[in-house]
Amino acid sequence: MKKILIVEGNLREENESFSKNGIQTHTESLKDSLSHFTNELSFDVVNPSSDQNIQLISDKLENYDGLIWGGSSLNIYDDTPEIKKQIEFMKDCQKKVKKILAICWGMQVAVTAAGGQVKKANNSHIGIANEIEVNENGIKHPLYINKDLSLIHI
C-alpha cells in the first residue's frame, strides 16, 4: 500500500465553515476521488498553517510515497504567518518527497518555495483544454474503464 500525504491549503476556520454548511473540504474531495479508483493508497492529512505537530510530520516526510498539495482560498501575494508556514513546509517537502502533485494553490506555494515568482494574470483564467486525445497507455488507466471515449474529447 502506498502512503500519500495530502496537504490542506485552507485555514482550519474556513474548512470548519465548509463542513458546517455541508460542503466537502478540498482534502476530503481528493481522498474520496482517489479512493474511488483504488484501495491501494493510505492517506495522512496535514495543515501546515494550523497543525501544531507540523515538525513531527516534517521529520517523517521520507516515509511518504507521494504528496498532494491542493487548492486554497489564500492569496500567495499576502504576507501572512499562515502562508509563510506553508512555504516553509513546502521547502521541506521539496527536499524530502520525490513525487509531489501540486494543484493550483499548491503550485503557487511550490514555485514560491523554490525561489520562483508567481505573477498575477491580466484577467481571470479557466482551465479549458481542447482537442485532447487519450493515447494507448492512457486508455488503460482505471479512470477510463467503461467510459465512452467520444465523451472525453473536447
Where are these regions (language model features)?
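Short, structurally constrained coil/turn elements
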Residues: 37-39, 112, 145
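Class I S-adenosyl-L-methionine
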Residues: 31-35, 111, 133
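N-terminal beta1-alpha1 cap of cysteine-dependent amidohydrolase-like domains
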Residues: 1-88, 92-96
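Gly/Ser/Thr-rich beta-alpha loop segments that engage phosphate groups in nucleotides
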Residues: 72-73, 104, 108, 117-118, ...
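Catalytic nucleophile loop
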Residues: 94-114
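Pocket-forming structural segment of enzyme catalytic cores
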Residues: 9, 114-154
